[in-house]
Amino acid sequence: MVKSRHSFFGSFSLNTVRIIGGEWRRRVLRFPDAQGLRPTPDRVRETLFNWLGQDLDGLSCLDLFAGSGALGFEAASRGAAKVVMVEHAPKVAAALEENARLLAAGGRLQIVRADAVKFASSLSATGARFDVLILDPPYKQGWIERLAPLLPQLLANDGALYVEAEYPIETIDACGDWKSVRSGRAGQVFYQLLRRTQHDGA
């Protein structure tokens, strides 16, 4: 098995990111270079999971731009019962699958090779809803605007929407009653947590 692992990760240039909390704390994730792929910095990840609560026990999460897997694996490490990670780039998706295998993640993690909008559209038609939805798309490609009409059908009523973008997001108009309840900035990256208006203060 060790030989197989080295053969897979030895086939392209690798970057690494470390899981910072939970069951897999300090475990290293390996991933290839890809256009638009930017792992969420440790400090930002720590802030996000402080917002969500360190223990995600029993929650379901959907990461539509999984990339390095930093956020999706972190959610699973912190107890999420189900994490669906969507990635379109074949090499990046293959690295996610290999990292999941090395972590012995089992049924908690589902890696999907697909276009984010097409997958979200097909998923919304099934009635599936998630407690946490993560959007960290490549910049300046209009992904958030294209996905916005689908988001209300993918999130539970009391769910949380986490967005990273190159600009601040207070609301997403096509989502209706969603607005930012937490926000921060790290360099040129704006990150925010949005919830339905009627759940503010809950």
What do these predicted ranges mean?
Residues 1-202:
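Class I S-adenosyl-L-methionine-dependent methyltransferase catalytic core
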